[in-house]
């Protein structure tokens, strides 16, 4: 069966990231003893969806010109995550965990827009990508012996967001053609909920849903057309949202 490049990259990422941890778990190393007995590590596969409330404003003072667009922009992809955490059970049924995570995704959203009037014709192509995320989260929960651990998730995430594309204009106003690209690291809050089921003494499986809300993505640029008119363009995605559905497996040091 053929796997596309993004899926192959994610599988390789999980393999090379996760394998050293299995080796550490099996050998008596200083790090191995440091991790016992309340730590765990694991990996998840991810299906994620991004939402961008995107606006583009363009002005030219020389032409007394203003143009704007508003798109409900979406992206989706597959990803992989590795995580390392520390947990404690108290008062029999209560649970608290602290977890660091790092994930890689093929998430991408493309858009094509054509605008034409008596003054100009424009073609706009663009792509939003979110490839890397990392962060720290707290897991408060409750343990039900016959079911598993129900937990919430509150954390902080950093996401690598890229906007790239091209714009081409022709008409009496003047013509121009160019590309743009900008990458920013955006912080945000992460909220989620999940369920962990015990498979063996050391192994658990996990199902989780996370909702991430990021800082505004703002990208300003300037350019000139063939008539030497200057244009100022502001692109903004208001608080991008990244939803993640995760299915994972983890190992407990016990």
Describe the role of every protein-language-model region.
Residues 45-77, 104-133, 158-186, 214-244:
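Extracellular/periplasm-exposed beta-strand and loop segments of Gram-negative cell-envelope proteins
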Residues 40-42, 197, 239-254:
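Outer-membrane beta-barrel "beta-signal"
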Residues 186, 190, 194-218, 240, ...:
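K/E-rich alpha-helical interaction surfaces of small helical-bundle regulatory domains
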Residues 1-32, 254:
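Cleavable N-terminal export/targeting peptides
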């Amino acid at each position: 069966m053929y796997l596309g490049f993004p899926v192959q990259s994610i599988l390789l990422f999980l393999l090379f990231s996760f394998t050293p941890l299995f080796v550490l778990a099996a050998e008596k190393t200083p790090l191995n003893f440091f991790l016992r007995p309340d730590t765990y590590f694991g990996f998840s596969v991810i299906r994620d969806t991004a939402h961008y409330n995107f606006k583009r404003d363009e002005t030219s003072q020389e032409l007394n010109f203003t143009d704007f667009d508003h798109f409900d922009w979406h992206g989706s992809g597959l990803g992989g995550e590795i995580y390392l955490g520390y947990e404690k059970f108290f008062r029999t049924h209560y649970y608290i965990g602290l977890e660091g995570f790092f994930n890689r995704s093929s998430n991408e959203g493309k858009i094509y827009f054509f605008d034409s009037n008596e003054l100009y014709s424009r073609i706009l192509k663009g792509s939003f990508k979110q490839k890397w995320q990392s962060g720290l989260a707290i897991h408060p929960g409750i343990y039900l012996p016959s079911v598993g651990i129900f937990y919430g998730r509150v954390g902080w995430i950093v996401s690598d967001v890229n906007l790239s594309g091209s714009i081409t204009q022709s008409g009496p106003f003047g013509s121009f053609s160019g590309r743009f690209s900008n990458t920013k690291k955006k912080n945000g809050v992460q909220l989620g909920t999940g369920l962990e089921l015990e498979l063996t003494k050391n192994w658990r499986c996990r199902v989780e849903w996370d909702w991430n809300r990021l800082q505004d993505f703002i990208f300003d640029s300037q350019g000139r057309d063939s008539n030497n008119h200057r244009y100022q363009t502001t692109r903004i995605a208001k608080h991008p949202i990244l939803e993640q559905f995760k299915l994972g497996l983890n190992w407990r040091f016990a």
